[in-house]
Amino acid sequence: MVENIKSNITNIMKENQGESSLSKIVPSIIKKGIDNVNLDMFDDTTRNNLLNAAGDEYVKRGDFVQAVKSFLLTKNIEKLNEIGDIYSSRGQFNQAVEVYSLSYNFSQDKNKLIHCGEKCILEGHYSDALRAFSIAKDETRLINLGEICLEKEKIDVAIEVFAVLNNTEKLIKLGDKCLNENRLGYAARAYEIANNKDKLSSLGDVLLKSGLLGSALRIYELANNEMMVKFIRENFSEDQLGKFYA
């Protein structure tokens, strides 16, 4: 029994010595920065402990960029998600989605991304919701987001949603709507992503009639309408071609 006690005491002392050594090294890591420190001389366990300890210290200091770098090197999913939660609670959804996506690369667990995406919708951050659902490959939520964006007149995001979904029918329908409402930039974007040459040429005709020659030329080029491209280039000056839609 006495020998067992001695053995336990020895193990505890070794553990404390190890922790003491780590605590002495961590400040040096913090000072140099994760990108500039070399920990190759340590075994994997010690190296990971050092990096995790450094990551915790960075979090305390509010330096989440360095903290993320630390936890990425140790593939510490839990700690990465904690940082994502901090960003999300502050309304910094761009950063939250980025960190959750890094965690997702290791875990393949979509829950954090989906929860963040839904929170983004509630708070009107539709582009961030698009990123979250796209990374999670959640088609159902992307479809719903597209409809919400149409309802809220967030046309730019709606176009990108339908682009991710590769829904050419929705893109063309939305492009037609934008064309009818004289929102020509959005119409051009929708038709271009849908890769519909006929619609692009029709838009080019509208732009030409409106005197927006620079935009008309660009759209005809996208439509591979060589006849109209040649017509514009041979009949109008460079100054005239400087007119674009807003």
Give the ranges of each region predicted by the language model.
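Long, low-complexity, acidic Ser/Pro- and Gly-enriched intrinsically disordered regions
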Residues: 1-246
